[in-house]
């Protein structure tokens, strides 16, 4: 009887220990799985944001390219062109070309928007803050292009053109990229802003 009771107790202890061990293993496994899942989510989000960032950089570079190719410059519809002077036809083509270049910038910003919202939910505000420098440079370039097109518009009256030129002359001229390897001030500021974002995101790409 003694040995039977002892054996039952031992068996109970063994079963309990096995259950506890199994629970510990399960909890550790769940913890590892959660870490792996979060790591994968961080990796994918960081990868998407970096790719979109590089595409945005290239789109902004394209806006500033000093050459405007013939295929970029459309003619107005024939019924409109027939009643337009050449300087207005030229301005129409330039405006459409810059609009097409800027549409590409807007497309990449739109692609970034949802991912930046997700990053804010997962990582906080730091990345959004880092993108503030990119947004400021983008807005500065937009104003520069907008003023250039207004000044060159044949329909802009002389007084408005003078006022716009005064504003333009008080600001730095960033319309054209100088295409040097070292880069101009605008490009170097953009590079520095991108490097700060890369430094934040690249640790999240380590798996």
Language model regions located:
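Membrane-embedded hydrophobic alpha-helical segments
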Residues: 1-36
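Transmembrane helix-loop junctions and nearby membrane-interface residues
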Residues: 23-30, 62-66, 144-151
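Amphipathic, membrane-active segments
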Residues: 31, 35-75
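Interfacial loop at the N-terminal end of multi-pass membrane proteins
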Residues: 68-80, 90-93
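An amphipathic alpha-helical interaction surface
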Residues: 80-83, 92, 96-207
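Interfacial juxtamembrane loops and adjacent helix segments
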Residues: 87
């Amino acid at each position: 009887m003694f040995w039977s009771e002892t054996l039952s107790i031992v068996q109970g202890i063994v079963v309990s220990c096995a259950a506890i061990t199994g629970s510990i293993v399960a909890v550790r496994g769940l913890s590892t799985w959660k870490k792996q899942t979060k790591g994968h989510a961080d990796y994918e989000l960081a990868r998407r944001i970096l790719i979109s960032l590089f595409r945005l950089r290239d789109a902004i570079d394209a806006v500033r390219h000093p050459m405007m190719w013939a295929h970029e410059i459309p003619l107005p519809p024939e019924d409109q062109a027939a009643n337009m002077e050449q300087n207005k036809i030229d301005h129409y083509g330039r405006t459409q070309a810059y609009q097409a270049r800027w549409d590409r910038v807007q497309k990449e910003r739109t692609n970034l928007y949802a991912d930046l919202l997700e990053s804010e939910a997962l990582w906080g505000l730091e990345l959004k803050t880092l993108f503030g420098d990119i947004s400021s440079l983008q807005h500065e370039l937009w104003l520069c292009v907008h003023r250039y097109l207004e000044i060159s518009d044949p329909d802009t009256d002389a007084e408005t053109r003078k006022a716009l030129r005064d504003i333009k002359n008080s600001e730095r001229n960033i319309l054209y990229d100088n295409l040097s390897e070292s880069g101009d001030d605008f490009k170097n500021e953009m590079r520095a802003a991108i490097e700060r974002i890369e430094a934040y995101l690249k640790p999240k790409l380590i798996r």
